[in-house]
Amino acid sequence: SYEQYFGPGTRLTVT
């Protein structure tokens, strides 16, 4: 899994 940050307050977590 990983986390990808697109900007302040915006986060995508993929297992």
UniProtKB/Swiss-Prot annotation:
GO biological process: adaptive immune response
Protein's cellular compartments: Cell membrane
Gene Ontology terms: cellular component: T cell receptor complex
Protein transport among keywords: no
Superkingdom per UniProt: Eukaryota
Keyword Cell membrane: yes
Main location: membrane
UniProtKB keywords: Adaptive immunity, Cell membrane, Immunity, Membrane, Receptor, T cell receptor
Subunit structure: Alpha-beta TR is a heterodimer composed of an alpha and beta chain; disulfide-linked. The alpha-beta TR is associated with the transmembrane signaling CD3 coreceptor proteins to form the TR-CD3 (TcR or TCR). The assembly of alpha-beta TR heterodimers with CD3 occurs in the endoplasmic reticulum where a single alpha-beta TR heterodimer associates with one CD3D-CD3E heterodimer, one CD3G-CD3E heterodimer and one CD247 homodimer forming a stable octameric structure. CD3D-CD3E and CD3G-CD3E heterodimers preferentially associate with TR alpha and TR beta chains, respectively.
Chain's role: J region of the variable domain of T cell receptor (TR) beta chain that participates in the antigen recognition. Alpha-beta T cell receptors are antigen specific receptors which are essential to the immune response and are present on the cell surface of T lymphocytes. Recognize peptide-major histocompatibility (MH) (pMH) complexes that are displayed by antigen presenting cells (APC), a prerequisite for efficient T cell adaptive immunity against pathogens.
Name used for this protein in its record: T cell receptor beta joining 2-7
Source organism phylogeny: Eukaryota, Metazoa, Chordata, Craniata, Vertebrata
